Regions:
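Structural marker of alpha-solenoid helical repeat scaffolds
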Residues: 29-30, 62-63
Length: 90
């Protein structure tokens, strides 16, 4: 699985968010994995799709309460609460 994680990270880092999301979605059809949802969230953030990213982080945090997605979700909730109160309802 680490090889897939690395590929998704590399695609996201070079700006190929469509490729990263396609690869993450392909693997998520095979198994529900917190790491994949976290990386999917990262790709969605880079693509500017923040609401979808928060949903991916939320799913990852439900699968694994120790996932880095927990911190990412808290960060985005804080940002949304501060800047976008009218666009986000907890």
């Amino acid at each position: 699985m680490q090889g897939v994680y690395g590929k998704i990270r590399a695609l996201t880092a070079r700006g190929d968010t469509a490729g990263a999301l396609a690869l993450a979605d392909e693997w998520l059809q095979k198994q529900d994995d917190a790491g994949l949802y976290y990386l999917r969230g990262n790709a969605l953030v880079k693509a500017g799709r923040r609401t979808e990213a928060m949903n991916a982080y939320l799913h990852a945090s439900r699968l694994d309460p120790d996932s880095p997605a927990v911190e990412a979700l808290a960060l985005w909730r804080g940002i949304m609460d501060f800047y976008c109160k009218d666009m986000y309802n907890p």
